[in-house]
Amino acid sequence: MGAALTLLGDLIATVSEAAAATGFSVAEIAAGEAAAAIEVQLASVATVEGLTTSEAIAAIGLIPQAYAVISGAPAAIAGFAALLQTVTGVSAVAQVGYRFFSDWDHKVSTVGLYQQPGMAVDLYRPDDYYDILFPGVQTFVHSVQYLDPRHWGPTLFNAISQAFWRVIQNDIPRLTSQELERRTQRYLRDSLARFLEETTWTVINAPVNWYNSLQDYYSTLSPIRPTMVRQVANREGLQISFGHTYDNIDEADSIQQVTERWEAQSQSPNVQSGEFIEKFEAPGGANQRTAPQWMLPLLLGLYGSVTSALKAYEDGPNKKKRKLSRGSSQKTKGTSASAKARHKRRNRSSRS
């Protein structure tokens, strides 16, 4: 009924505009008298002056839109009357049906509700239920909702501006932070790589010598504990000393000699513990970056460009287990089972 009233309002407004433009009354346009008078005038002008219909309409001072409204108004009013009658009849039928079915009570089973009080009465449908049945329908509905067909220009501009503002507000800070993070990582890695290239490296054997000394010390230790060795020495009347010997210190005549001999014994020899690695510049004056071969895996790893050859050199070849065939595996299982069976029989015979 609301749609019919809307159409009636649009029809009245259109007919009123045509009446104001031509001078005819609304009743004459609705009855068709205005259309008949205009048709007679157009026919006479076209016959006398030899003009076409469109030229005749322009000659009498009408516009095509007003002529279309005046000529089509009687038919439109008749169709609207039929539509209004149909809508009125449908509304009456709906009213009768509402009155008839208002007293009818549809019972819902509540047996399961007592067992499960939190059970939902309606079926659960997810948000993308219709999009699963009809792919793309959600996007279409959102587009229709955001764009108004009557004012598509302002709504389109509003939607585009809101999307652009969301990009500026959400995406640009995230992309900026990611780019800053990547730039910082590249800068730190490049600085560390250049520091390692420019640093003077020295080959030091001190850790190796220290581990060798520990190995020699533990290899010379007796398997018997020192307390047991002292007990045996006291019982046998022997004198055993653990650690350093102080014979040269015991034979000193003065405290100064004891101090000098102790310092001489405890002082480590002044031995050079490493050799400097010589750095070579790029040949031919190219001023390119150079690095020793043993440093290449480290530098390439910092820049993230380790080749497969360097990976194989660093990690070693991949050792894959040999796959046994089905027959050999069954044979192995059979051999182990038979060995277990013989072992059981042998134990059984030994008990008997």
UniProtKB/Swiss-Prot annotation:
UniProt-listed GO biological process terms: monoatomic ion transmembrane transport; symbiont entry into host cell via permeabilization of host membrane; viral penetration into host nucleus; virion attachment to host cell
Protein name: Minor capsid protein VP2
Residue segments, region D1: 273-308
Effect of residue 348 to T: Partial loss of DNA-binding activity
GO CC list: host cell; host cell endoplasmic reticulum membrane; host cell nucleus; membrane; viral capsid
Statement: the UniProt record of this protein carries the keyword Cytoplasm: no
Biased composition (Polar residues): 326-338
Biased composition (Basic residues): 340-352
Chain positions covered by the region annotation Disordered: 313-352
Chain ranges passing through the membrane: 290-310
Keyword line: Capsid protein, DNA-binding, Host endoplasmic reticulum, Host membrane, Host nucleus, Host-virus interaction, Ion channel, Ion transport, Late protein, Lipoprotein, Membrane, Myristate, Transmembrane, Transmembrane helix, Transport, Viral attachment to host cell, Viral ion channel, Viral penetration into host cytoplasm, Viral penetration into host nucleus, Viral penetration via permeabilization of host membrane, Viral release from host cell, Virion, Virus entry into host cell
Pfam family membership, one: Polyoma_coat2
Stretches the record annotates as DNA-binding: 313-352
Organism: Simian virus 40
A single GO molecular function term of this UniProt record: structural molecule activity
Domain remark in the UniProt entry: The D1 region of isoform VP2 and isoform VP3 is necessary and sufficient to direct the interaction with VP1. The basic-rich C-terminal region of isoforms VP2 and VP3 is sufficient for DNA-binding and may cause compaction of the DNA.
Keyword Transmembrane among UniProt keywords: yes
